[in-house]
Amino acid sequence: MRDQKYGAVVNIGSVAGQLGVSEGAIYGILKASVTHYTRCLATELKQHGVRVNCVAPGPMKTARFEATRIVDPEMMDSQKAPLVRYGEPGEIANAVAFLLSDQAKFINGQVLCVD
């Protein structure tokens, strides 16, 4: 990408890295570091024409999520959750595809919360 002076990277963070999540401190800290790394890398690689962004999913309907249930189900009914449902993996894929596309060629160093 550096040699071509063009490219895009999308890291996967989590809204848990943006918000405090009950009983999820370590997970939240790790995902917050992904957000910080994204912004640092975006600054470092912009001179090479490489964009770096991050998608931060909210609670997703996956087998792992069903097994761990890190997010309190009551949160889904509170005002903290923008939508009262779990996301689907395909919705995250759409956000990643957008950030990798030329439609997002003026977006760099951003975190797109998909929740």
Language-model regions, residue ranges each:
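Residue(s) in the substrate-gating loop at a strand-loop-helix junction
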Residues: 14
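Conserved catalytic-site region of short-chain dehydrogenase/reductase
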Residues: 17-19
